[in-house]
């Protein structure tokens, strides 16, 4: 146990794993359960005292006066259209961006490519690495054919040195890789701790607002998928991006979860190749290109990610369970939502899944959070259990309630247009789905899940797998 510090009655202790703050030291964090992760939180200054305040307490501008003085928001675009989309249309000056992702997922590769694109566009770009030497970054740039681009490289972990460099160079864009390696001599804790991460993020964000430099901070994520360090860092910055993907899958998803200058929940799709990350401008066609011959348990969901319509394949497998407690396994969707759909199918439609293992997968490594996927999940589960092949020209969307009703969802026109563009002819959707003029697509409306199940079993031109031969 650490020794008590005299004269510090207001000391706090924080967890290095989750950022939870307590008033006293403990061996185990009560929030996340990790051991030996509590340390004293030597925070930043609490601000000036009343006696030290100046005569001027702040400058205020009337809101109506901003019309004449405020300039339109200027954005700088790069040739990576997927990145521009996620940023809300381009890079905004004086913005602070936090990019998180698993180790080895491709964060540094993406940002090095982006830095090269912005440098070619005329932005003075500085890439500071706290994890690699400048020569190592140079080798990585050479592998990506970026070694001739006008990027300035640096390698340092001391916050004072980094701020001095930024003050001297005054770049348009500075990339700090990563925030967990930066340490400040004003904070008495090890690099990567909650106090150090918060202090570094505060100083760098303040510099961005004061100087007009756009700052990109790279952050590691915890095993729960959250950016490591205190959540206050996400509140400091303007934009929070997550770089997602599976190690064995070539696709990567750049997802915006916060953006003060654009739409949140926007995604950009990239493919990892030997020459770095290549953008995927039509992800729906790419995700469905490997679908192959339709099989039982497979159907297509017409979804929306941010402002982008996206068609993905939902795959389900239902088999007898050899265990006393059947298994429910989900990849790419919410497991609690799957449990709810199974319960509604049993209670409202009399389709029993007890004694059966259920597996659900979103093809392509995507993570779907939309409740509009409920109907597609129900269709794939019924198809898998009843051994029915759904015709390949069908797409599905709709939210399922606990009563079994199928509720309407948003952005229906975008879903229908994307489905028709990729050759789909029929849509199973909720009631009150407005037809879009000029679209050659047939819409089948569904009031509740029971009528949908009956239609799927009897009236959708089903093909039993035993009759395929």
Which residues fall in each region the model found?
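Conserved RecA-like ASCE P-loop NTPase motor core of nucleic-acid helicases/translocases
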Residues: 125-129
